[in-house]
Regions:
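Conserved short-loop catalytic and cofactor-binding motifs
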Residues: 48, 122, 199
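Juxtamembrane/interface motifs at transmembrane-helix termini
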Residues: 60-63, 94-95, 227-232
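A generic structural signal for short coil/turn motifs at secondary-structure boundaries
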Residues: 51, 111-114, 222-223
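A very general structural signal that marks isolated residues within well-ordered alpha-helical segments
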Residues: 33, 81, 108, 217-218
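Beta-strand-rich binding/interaction modules
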Residues: 71-74, 84-176, 208
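Short capping/connector residues at structural and topological boundaries
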Residues: 8, 20, 92, 159, ...
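Hydrophobic alpha-helical and helix-loop surface patches within well-folded domains
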Residues: 1-92, 100-102
Length: 234
């Protein structure tokens, strides 16, 4: 069910992990998108308008939008659309132009209550690591005057989009979904070597732990498969 169900049989239906844990992650996404200062401005306006009142999710999101002069109408789908989105990523590196392209595609599987799904607003925080494990400076080709960042938060709001980073001196290792930037499944075809590299070098603690866990699970899966088929353990 979505964070804010359209109906319920009894009030206990609201005391679920979806409402409380996913709901909290959706609020945290706003901070990721708006920045800490922008989120604080929205929270101040929300309290100024509604302190002591009975309010709704719509009142909260409206205060965030008004304080930051931005449109959050599509973001509101997080409250009404059920299911866990999957973001599939593909990358390519052009040595001649020194550009790195990241392509992202989102899809939310049909659920029992909702067959048709609409694109959500998904913040995707990424980093690029060089061969020594250092974070590269990130600037998008279409934002040449932007201040370089070690972690860049991209916004995936359509079904698919792509971003091109400039002045990338070598083929980097992608650190995808830093800080668990959205409650989605990030799908990217990491090799065992890339996972080991991220586990040892990624500056983002969440992704470093995630890479180590995936690496261990992959190794265990291979060992179990080998044992079942009577092969030598890898």
């Amino acid at each position: 069910h979505p964070i804010r169900p359209d109906s319920y049989r009894e009030i206990n239906n609201f005391y679920t992990m979806t409402v409380y844990e996913k709901g909290a992650e959706v609020i945290r996404m706003l901070q990721t998108m708006l920045g800490k200062d922008g989120f604080r401005k929205g929270l101040d306006l929300y309290i100024q308008r509604h302190d002591g009142c009975a309010v709704t999710c719509d009142d909260f999101i409206r205060a965030m939008a008004d304080a930051n002069k931005t449109d959050l109408a599509q973001f509101s789908r997080w409250w009404s659309q059920s299911g866990t989105p999957r973001v599939t990523a593909e990358t390519s590196y052009d040595e001649t132009t020194r550009t790195f392209t990241l392509r992202g595609r989102q899809a939310t599987p049909a659920t029992a209550d909702q067959k048709e799904k609409e694109p959500l607003v998904i913040p995707v925080s990424v980093g690029l690591l060089d061969g020594a494990g250092n974070d590269m400076d990130l600037v998008l080709v279409d934002q040449p005057d932007a201040v370089p960042e070690k972690t860049k938060t991209l916004i995936l709001s359509d079904e698919a989009d792509e971003w091109v980073f400039k002045d990338i001196p070598e083929n980097p290792v992608l650190s995808l979904g830093r800080g668990f930037s959205a409650p989605v499944v990030f799908d990217y075809g990491y090799s065992r070597e890339e996972l080991a590299f991220l586990a040892g070098h990624d500056s983002d603690a969440f992704n470093r732990a995630e890479a180590f866990e995936r690496l261990v699970l992959n190794c265990l899966s291979e060992m179990i498969d080998a044992a079942e088929h009577g092969d030598d353990l890898p």
